[in-house]
Amino acid sequence: MSSTSDVTTQVTKLLSQAGMRPRGIQSEAISAGLLEGQSIMVCSPTGSGKTLVGEMALLRAVTCDKKGLYLVPLRALAVQVFKTMKDRYEHMGVRIGLSTGDYQGSGEELDEFDIVVTTYERTDSLLRKKTSWLPFIGAVVIDEIQTLSEIGRGARLESLIIRLKKSLSELQIVALSATIGAPDELAEWLGCRLIESYERPIPLVYRIISTSDRNNSIRKLVMTTVQGNGQAIVFHRTRREAEAYAKRLAEDVGRQFTTEEKMKLDQELDSVENYNVTLSSELRAVLRNGIAYHHAGLGYNGRRIVERLFNSGQVRVICATTTLAAGMDLPARTVILSNMKSPSDYKQFLSTNTVHQMLGRAGRPSHDKIGFGVIIAGSTGEADEAKSRYFESSIDEKTNKEQLIPKYERINSTLGQASSLTEQLLVVLDMLDAATIEEIENGILGDSYLIHCAIRDSRAPMRVLQLGDISAITVLERHALPETVQSGRKNLLGRTMIREKNETVLGGIVTSVDGGQYTCRFSARLSTAGLVEGPMCSCGLPITEDGILCHHLITLGMTAASELGTLADYVIPLSLSETSPAGFLIRLGLIEGATDGKIKPTKLGRATNRLYLSIPTVREILALLPMTENSSSLLWLLRHIISIETGTTLDESFDNLLSNIITSDVPIRDLALLFGFSIGDVYGLIDTSRWLLHSISVLAELGSMTKVLELSQGLAVSLERRFTNNVEEED
């Protein structure tokens, strides 16, 4: 192995040949031991140079005859990082690879590369498959690590990090994050030295505008920016809103261009390079006015054209969805958030970190002296909500005016979600071959970020992990603070008179120590909306947002557990939607008992894990495969499980689309238009279909379902042939 000085010299030489010299946080990272193998976490604003810190770690790994992985949350971002690194380093002999999606592939072909840029999920898939070259990894860069707090994929990322650290003893981790709350807590868990910076290359001013006319207010902000020779990005809740607003603004923006500027833009759009790019007539029309919309429904080439024209200044305005928020390198003078509500749920506000990731794009280095991040509120009440939710405020000593200072959320683990625990129990068992519940809880999952945070959080419940059998007491411990449980065991919380006890409801009157009386109930009955009624208490706050039950319900639950035994063990977990991860996997036939009290994956369980299927998806496949008798029912099954995996709603138009893709010679872009799909969505659906058809084939073969196996393999072969011949030229 090369000495530290040799490594530093070689990495510095590579950077110099690429025309770069470390500065700012990059120099800080080197001083902190980056080129000596020290793991580093960088927490700093957009545009501060975080990416190069990761690249230096990867170059260090390569000079030490190791491989490097660069992990990102989105395929589009993976392509962007790949192209940048390929342009910088491949001519120096550093081989750069790209791998996204393709969960059915083994990844063995990636062994030829020194550095692989990929997504979290693809890396997780490779690790589950135990790809042969993974032991040779020396450095892993995890970009946008704040994704850890996302439901579902955050738990998968957390598990991936745990398993990488367990598998690779000398692994160097470089974690990159936008500014977040309590970054030291995350850095400590990762084993990283923290480099934190709040300095921005361009100063950013925040504003909240209260208006009864959102569209007009946005128009004024955009036009002021464009007329000042600046650029603007407007974030919208939905694709439809982004497209509609781009069309609405097109003529106004277009009038700000000179004849010469318009001519150059027209020439660019009509050039041979762009002639065959899949752009809708609507997008081409607005692009000719120097404005565009940007979302995941566009094909890759369409997004690339929009991004390139914006970076060159030929497009002045982008109306976007959140696809631009997650790491895409597109700063603008003015960034406008048109609505604070979540795209998936209008009742939910966007998270603080998500909002500041969007607004943090304001201010383009070398072009702007200042950036503006603006939130549009529909009323004074909404403006007050935006201010209290997303900002602190202070008085500027120079101007004596109020200035808004961003608030940032700490990153919370989502591994404790029941669905995530169930999946990760199977993942860990496949990794270990066999283990007891206690070995997993105290071992590999005991090293999780979930436990790391719980140990340091006074608000954490007494029991964080419960993988095995559940009872009324274990469930209460998952929803109560330690001191509450201890007081309950000593009968210090009050006394209970049980009034209701049946297979759906346990209820009674709880008299607290101060003499107050409360009507409490654990109800497993379904409401008219089809949801479990859950815990109820006349105190008005039966359960907090963090899942902590009130003292009165804990008192009722402990009394019921003592007096009613198995009835309480049945009703209380149901009322709180708690299940045993191990019990659930056993019922599905994914794990089974082994020797010495251990459990292990079945053949079906190992296949499920390595196919990268979620537990809800495999449950549906196993239930519906016996009823899949022809192509129509197979397409229905495929549509159903795609909806589960992606969280989207599909109807029969998907069946018609896929059937026509396979059987006709009509270009895919034309079929997308015919059946009402965006071209970007179609290629995503095809990719997902290829993976899930492969999964169906594997599970059908395991179940000796010859007919389904033939159907799924036939459909997969036809789809693969058509896709390979007609895939959009995205490379």
Residue ranges of predicted features:
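SF2 helicase catalytic motif II
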Residues: V116, Y120-D124, K130-I173
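Conserved C-terminal RecA-like helicase domain
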Residues: L69-Y70, V79-F82, K86-G97, R240-V317, ...
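Long, low-complexity, compositionally biased intrinsically disordered regions
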Residues: C453, D457-P573
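Conserved SF1/SF2 helicase motif Ia
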Residues: A57-V81, S167-E170
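Conserved pre-motif I regulatory segment
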Residues: S2-C43
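C-terminal helical accessory/scaffold domains
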Residues: V427, A435, T566, Y570-D731
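Conserved interdomain linker/interface between the two RecA-like ATPase lobes of SF2 helicase motors
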Residues: I162, Q172-V253, A285-A296, S379
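Conserved segment of the helicase C-terminal RecA-like domain
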Residues: L171, L330, T334-L337, K341-P343, ...
